[in-house]
Amino acid sequence: MNIKHRVILSVSMVVLLILIGGPSGAGRQTQPDLVLVAAERSHTEVITSSQQSFSITAPADTPLENASIQLEVVAGEAVNPHLRSSGAVDCSSLKSVVADVVTPGMNSEEKALALWRFVMDACYHGRWGTSLDGLEHLNVYGYGYCGTYAAVLESLWWTAGLTARHVNIGNHAATEVYYDNSWHYIDADTRAFYLLKDNRTIASLEELNDNPELWTMLRRGSSRKAGKKQYYMTMHPNGHGRSPVYTNDFSMAKGDVMTLGWQSRGKWCLNRGEEGGKEPAWEPPYYGNGLFRFHRDFANPSQSRSGLVSSTNIDWQDGEAGYLHPQKAKQEASLVYRVKTPYFMPEATLSGRFLRKGTSDSLELDISTDNGKRWVTIWRAEGTGSVKGSAVTTQTQQVTTNVPWKYSYLMRLRMRAGKSSRDVGAYNLESASVLAYNLRCLPALRQGANRITFSDEAKASRTVKVTYSWRDDLPVRLSNDTPMEGEQVSVSVRVANRGAAEAVNVPVFLYFGNPSQGGVEIGRETIARIPAGGSGLATFSWKATRKIAGKAVNPGAQLYAVVNPDNRVPESDETNNSFSRTVKVLNPPDVRIPSESFIRFESVKERPQSLAIVATVRNLSNSAAHGLFLDDQAAGESVVVTVYDGNPAKGGKEIGRETIPKLLPLEYRNVSVQWDIAQIKGAHTVYVQIHPPVNLTRALGVKTSSTMAVPIDLDAYRRCKGK
């Protein structure tokens, strides 16, 4: 066969291979590529001043998922860098929390309740205590029990200018706040406060002890017995409890990067606190993990002194070497740096690039978590030449809330030159510390316009890059992004085809929970065709729930969409076929009059022939079993309250009505309707009817009204009034 024929045959074989899709995946380039992806967004701002603001605008009509915040020091040193977002409460200090939560014109009770509500939205009940410093608990942990809740709430009350106290009432730390010349018991851990019989005044612990029947919000069947309080404790008025004082001050120098992510990576604090015992703590249901990268490049020694605690026998003047080395041979040289962050550090990786010319030269990396009293060696150089060293340690678990140098550790490099001082040295030194923190206190973005403010206390010039990353235009969309438990919602899954060929009969599955971990299938649909470069939509009906086997899933319902799970449709990339999204499913509002004792008859001074019927209506939606936070409960919207003389089902006459625009979880309102009794005598039964909130009816269909009836003898009322 001549060359010409061999060439023609070769070309023909190539064409044939392309047409039949082989070999080595050549045909995959002409296949579809089915993907479930969101739009990945980011915004980077370069900061050069001590205070600088910028705007980030996210779509207002589509859900947004925060991904990460990154601070990178490009030049100089940032001292106590701080970010504030208009979309979140600023938790950098107790004062900033109060400034964001308390609004002008609030009275003392409104301030106390607003801060109480904030604490229940920022923290959740855990199985053990954490910090007794309010600011630390907010930022670092966010979970705990009564004592830690008290540390946060009482500190915030003091900061707001209120007087507060922490009361031990027997295996429970309670909080009271003082205003209007009396104490008032308001508890964030148990999510409760109780009203006196006037249905207006929040009771104190003394008053509850005197009237044990008030110990339930319903005032029905309380088995509580009056008891003595064991002792009183008052948190320090500057906002700190018994824990060593927490500070979120820290510095970052050139090369340092802090990344705060919205995902948990399986790294948390194993310490249970003072009362939790010695066993390792279970994984909290809700927390975030980030990373702090501490980096010192010794090519320019003059820029490597930030964070330096001490140096011994180090030649800082030899700039020509390109690395740091001992000043004198045969003597140990050392560098000690402090790594400090505002957050708990479950583990750290210490690393660097070093020089070790011979076996007589030595290099070691040590860590100290007790401020230099004790050192643990975690790495020794074994090779020679240019050596890369790295070691992972969980020694940082010891730097907890109980030590005054929280959250920091010392990193030490020790080296010794056997012959010449230049025979051993360090080109760079680095640590990567995993961070654990309360996600609810990060400066997050919200839908729509966001204003971000960076500030620090650096006196010299510095350049910092701030990058926000988030996802929007999610491929899994709901007809209602915050449905109520039991609400029927439509879920649409958008499948894009980024390949070069059309896809037909594309199967799409939707699960509640991760299908690889026992997730429950919601449904399956088939998209008839998705053209190359186009997209298709699969629509499902889902009865919203966050419960699996009767138990609520936190922090919300995980919806998993999977396209082409069995690879029935040949495609070029099978690694991008799933997407998950967390949906906050709300516990429906429970709006009612707790009991008959919450309906009172009061005289009207300016209208002696009228009687005021005052009904206390409360949203009792408060199931800690449904969700971690109070905002997992739904508000009641447009609640109509109608008062009747007689049973409305049997022709009772309407006296009047009032609409409550909104009732937040645990909020109450006193509805007052005036009844003209000038021509009415004798015994009557007043019925107060609570119509279901409009948003409840819209979500779950028509619901029956709740009715409470109380008798009144108008003749007896007049006789008492005459006295």
Where are these regions (language model features)?
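Exposed low-complexity, polar/acidic, P/S/T/G-rich flexible segments that act as propeptides
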Residues: 407, 416-471
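A short beta-strand element within beta-rich, extracytoplasmic domains
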Residues: 343-357, 491-493
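Conserved Ser/Thr-centered positions that define the repeating blades of beta-propeller domains
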Residues: 366-370
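Alpha-helical and coiled-coil interaction segments, frequently adjacent to or embedded
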Residues: 35-38, 196, 200-308
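Short beta-strands within extracellular/lumenal beta-sheet-rich domains
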Residues: 319-347, 394-396
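Hydrophobic/aromatic-rich core segments of domains that either
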Residues: 151-225
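Secondary-structure boundary elements
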Residues: 54-141
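Extracellular/luminal regions of secreted and cell-surface proteins that mediate adhesion/ECM remodeling
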Residues: 471-723
